[in-house]
Amino acid sequence: MTDSDGKTDKSGEPAAEVEPVVSKPYVMPDDPEDDALDALNKQLAEAKDRTLRTLAEMENLRKRTAREVSDARTYGISGFARDVLEIADNLQRALDAVPADARAAPDPGLKALIEGVELTERSLHNALEKHGVKKFDPAGEKFDPNVHQAMYEVPDPSIPVGTVAQVIQAGYMIGERVLRPALVGVAKGGAKAAAPE
């Protein structure tokens, strides 16, 4: 059972013609308004700026943290070293308290004691230097308030003004920092010190 077109349905009756489905044409929405595009560009620029600032801040934080860790390694023992300096000073005072004629005496017990104190002092200074603590003796140097502490003035015309004439107590540095300033007497007489070149 076919019709003249050759189309039949199961019941043998001619099939109804089916109209082909045609999709509706796609209509483009109106172009975004210029204001909306400007707003998106502004948001993009702000996001880029925030990202760059965050990256820069993170890099600065990394550098600052590395510097703080380095400083902690170098200067972390400052408090302990300051306390140990008192021991070094006491050892030096003990050696200074022994009169020269007693050092020359043939007493083996006294000589052994003096040698023991000297050895202990050297060992202590070596241990301090191993950890970055260095002793400095500024005798004859130009007075520098950053590393010297003036205790008094020395009226000596043979020494240029502003020169360290006497050292009462040696100073100590840890790395590039002053751990303890040197206690000094500064010359107030004589010619002015020559300017360093």
From Swiss-Prot:
Claim: Isomerase is one of the keywords in the record: no
Region called Disordered, residue ranges: 1-35
Chief localisation class: cytoplasm
Gene3D superfamilies: 3.90.20.20, Head domain of nucleotide exchange factor GrpE
Residue ranges, compositional bias (Basic and acidic residues): 1-12
Tagged with keyword Chaperone: yes
Subcellular location: Cytoplasm
Signal sequence coordinates: none
Superkingdom of this protein's organism: Bacteria
Keywords, comma-separated and alphabetical: Chaperone, Cytoplasm, Stress response
Disulfide bond annotation, renumbered to this chain: none
Gene Ontology CC entries for this record: cytoplasm
GO molecular function: adenyl-nucleotide exchange factor activity; protein homodimerization activity; protein-folding chaperone binding; unfolded protein binding
Biological process terms in GO annotation: protein folding
Summary of subunit composition and partner proteins: Homodimer.
Role, per record: Participates actively in the response to hyperosmotic and heat shock by preventing the aggregation of stress-denatured proteins, in association with DnaK and GrpE. It is the nucleotide exchange factor for DnaK and may function as a thermosensor. Unfolded proteins bind initially to DnaJ; upon interaction with the DnaJ-bound protein, DnaK hydrolyzes its bound ATP, resulting in the formation of a stable complex. GrpE releases ADP from DnaK; ATP binding to DnaK triggers the release of the substrate protein, thus completing the reaction cycle.
HAMAP family: GrpE
Family: Belongs to the GrpE family.
Protein's name in the database: Protein GrpE
